[in-house]
């Protein structure tokens, strides 16, 4: 199992993160694979940069509104950053409805 520090310290991730950060002003013109944007959100979460984690999660939800992975991350953010159990339940219900 790769630890988070190693996962975020490789050339490919650094390139993806640099692309994301460089495009902050115009994200609509950029495309990211769901795994890449999820890694970006996880990276900011790992670094305790909640504001940027929220932005990355919102961007992921914009690109992939029905992705279970994105909905899980939204639920985690709602629960652990917002302390909003009702919002977390809402995302969990959306995931459940897909299955």
Predicted regions and their residues:
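Hydrophobic/aromatic side-chain positions at a characteristic register within alpha-helices
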Residues: 32, 45, 79-80, 96
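Structural register within alpha-helical repeat arrays
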Residues: 39-40, 74
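Residue-level signature for tetratricopeptide repeat
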Residues: 42-43, 47, 60, 77-78
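Canonical positions in the second alpha-helix
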Residues: 60, 94-95
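Short coil turns that delineate tetratricopeptide repeat
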Residues: 65, 97-99
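TPR-adjacent "capping" and linker segments in tetratricopeptide-repeat scaffold/adaptor proteins
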Residues: 2-11, 21-34, 93
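Structural signature of tandem alpha-helical TPR/SEL1-like repeats
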Residues: 48-54, 80-92
